[in-house]
Amino acid sequence: MKRALVFFLLALPVFAQNKLTDTALTPACGPDDAKFAVKTAKSGRPAIQPDEGKALVIFVEDDSEFASHPKPTTRTGLDGNWIGATHGNSYFSFSVDPGEHHLCASWQTSIIVGQGHKTAAAHFTAEAGTVYYFRAKNTWARDVGTADISLKPLDSDEGQLLTSKFSLSTFHPKK
């Protein structure tokens, strides 16, 4: 009994330490407590013409391999600030200045099914006049049992195909 008590007292400081969240570990994400309200609506093809002197990024959330409900709401971070969110199979676009940028995709809330990654990151170097597609792919399969997210660049043809099938995401910060 004394041995167990001594072990518990010695181990207590380890359990009391603050764990860094996934979003704190990448320079792309914003504060972990930021939340968005998201609406999606089926629309036509997105405008894919960048503003003068800018690049255009189209962020796509793909839940086609997420076999559970509810689907995650995915926040998008750029260079340390949250800039928007998606839910379900949806997308939105934003302009960036030329140069190096860091992207983050992070689930707004924890997903109960499994303990996979809930944040993913990527970086790219934007050139003026160029359109970039990125896909946040959310996955969960009953036989694997772990939910996961990945963030990868997409070929422009695949990006246009997905945005023609998916809904446009609109969002605003929750208060």
Task: Label each PLM-derived region with a short phrase.
Residues 17-175:
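Short loop/turn and low-complexity linker motifs enriched in small/turn-promoting residues
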Residues 8-16:
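Hydrophobic h-region of N-terminal signal peptides that target proteins for export
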Residues 2-7:
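Sec-dependent signal peptide recognition
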